[in-house]
């Protein structure tokens, strides 16, 4: 019993330290880097000079920009042209807010242009991290390659993923995930953030604790993946963990 109690105490301490590290990472000036790039560089340059640089694309009327990330040869970020911190923002469950996941999926073409040939849809993944799983305080969806092992696991579970949010057998990367199948027409009409908030019990009240990802399946449907922060299992809900920014899947 004493050993069990000590182990539990150690886990609590680790969780608290992890939470503290996550908070520290989000309180420094560097956490505003992406926001400053969008609001002080990309957007003004597009409006004044019709040049999106340093972004790859700026769409003021649609409310988003696309930026080449420095990490990895093909990774891009889709971000709003206005202030949204992250998954905790109530704006994301407002139907009038742009459907950023659908927009990010359209922006996958930047990967192919950079690569010099078509990057197949099965190799592409989208991900956004939770409040404690991110390093930046400006909403950004990672557009990048999927890890080969995650691709294989999702392929093997194709028949087990339904149109309801259900636990993905075995989870991913050692963490629990909910999975939901969506069609392209569904995705066009409803944001994954709204699906999560309306369909998973108590999710609306804790949206900031979720990381969310999206991958295309072999039957042309999409699978949405949601993981919730659980510091006792050292899960900071960094959905980006399903991605491989070096794109081994293309080799």
Swiss-Prot record:
Annotated catalysed reactions: a CDP-1,2-diacyl-sn-glycerol + H2O = a 1,2-diacyl-sn-glycero-3-phosphate + CMP + 2 H(+)
Biological process (GO), any one: CDP-diacylglycerol catabolic process
Pathway in which the depicted protein is active: Phospholipid metabolism; CDP-diacylglycerol degradation; phosphatidate from CDP-diacylglycerol: step 1/1
Top-level class of the enzyme under EC nomenclature: hydrolase
Domain of life: Bacteria
The keyword Chaperone appears for this protein: no
One GO cellular component, as annotated: plasma membrane
Membrane spanning residue stretches: 4-24
GO molecular function: CDP-diacylglycerol diphosphatase activity
Keywords: Cell inner membrane, Cell membrane, Hydrolase, Lipid biosynthesis, Lipid metabolism, Membrane, Phospholipid biosynthesis, Phospholipid metabolism, Transmembrane, Transmembrane helix
InterPro entries: CDP-diacylglyc_Pase, CDP-diacylglyc_Pase_proteobac, HIT-like_sf
E.C. number(s) listed in UniProt: 3.6.1.26
Coarse class of the protein's main subcellular location: membrane
Topology in membrane: Single-pass membrane protein
Compartments, record wording: Cell inner membrane
Similarity remark: Belongs to the Cdh family.
Protein's UniProt name: CDP-diacylglycerol pyrophosphatase
Species classification: Bacteria, Pseudomonadati, Pseudomonadota, Gammaproteobacteria, Enterobacterales
Gene behind this protein: cdh
């Amino acid at each position: 019993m004493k050993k069990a109690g000590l182990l539990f105490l150690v886990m609590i301490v680790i969780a608290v330290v992890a939470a503290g590290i996550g908070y520290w990472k989000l309180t420094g000036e560097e956490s505003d880097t992406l926001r400053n790039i969008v609001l002080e560089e990309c957007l003004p340059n597009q409006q004044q000079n019709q040049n999106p640089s340093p972004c790859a694309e700026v769409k003021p009327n649609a409310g988003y920009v696309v930026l080449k990330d420095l990490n990895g040869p093909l990774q891009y970020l889709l971000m709003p042209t206005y202030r949204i911190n992250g998954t905790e923002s109530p704006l994301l469950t407002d139907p009038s807010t742009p459907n950023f996941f659908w927009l990010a999926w359209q922006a996958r073409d930047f990967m192919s242009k950079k690569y010099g040939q078509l990057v197949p849809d099965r190799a592409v993944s989208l991900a956004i991290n939770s409040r404690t799983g991110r390093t930046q305080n400006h909403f950004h969806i990672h557009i990048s390659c999927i890890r080969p092992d995650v691709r294989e696991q999702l392929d093997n579970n194709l028949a087990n993923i339904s149109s309801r949010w259900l636990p993905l057998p075995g989870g991913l990367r050692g963490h629990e995930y909910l999975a939901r199948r969506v069609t392209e027409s569904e995705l066009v009409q409803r944001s994954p953030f709204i699906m999560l908030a309306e369909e998973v019990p108590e999710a609306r009240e804790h949206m900031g604790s979720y990381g969310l990802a999206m991958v295309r399946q072999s039957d042309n449907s999409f699978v949405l993946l949601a993981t919730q922060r659980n510091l006792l299992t050292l899960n900071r809900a960094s959905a980006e963990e399903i991605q491989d920014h070096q794109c081994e899947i293309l080799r």
